[in-house]
Amino acid sequence: MRKLKLVNGTVFYHGRFQNLDLTIDKGRIVRLDLPSLSGSSVSPISPFSNENNEIVMDCSHLHIFPGFVDLHVHFREPGFSYKETIETGSRAAAHGGYTVCCTMPNLKPVPDTLENLEVQRAIIRDKAVVHVLPYGAITCGEKGAKLANFEELAPYVVAFTDDGVGVADEGRMREAMVKAKALGKTLSLIHI
């Protein structure tokens, strides 16, 4: 795979936006330089090869970001694929510059056990075009009563939430907070 050189782009670096050239090799930024093509008339949609056989794209008047993260998406698969699928949602995310999406657990089956979560994870492995990280449910079936098995789910989920439903019992919520903290996980409690 050839290196990609993005020239004259605006990059957030060392706490401020500045014009820089980036060289990317195998998906990683390997070099940052001052702009090399100032005043270039190369179109950003017409890449060319330079003397180092790098693919070069002029990014004048463009901002370069490594990728955005969406912490709250509804790729409603499994169970509600008539609304959205992991494939369609992740393709839309990629089109908008998102490289990571975290999926809410209001699915069927609810990812409240490792077995249920594995249904979703299999689809993610097969269909996602960006990194898709699932949330686990705080309670079984998102019913607000019995806690899901956090210890079992924690290695495979980004965090825990009963998205849009909530956990009304104060004691149950406290128990969830203690378990999440012990496992180094977050509880997502706000739905906007």
Where are these regions (language model features)?
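Active-site metal-binding motif and surrounding structural segment of the metallo-beta-lactamase
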Residues: 43-64
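N-terminal metal-binding scaffold of metallo-dependent hydrolase/deaminase domains
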Residues: 1-48
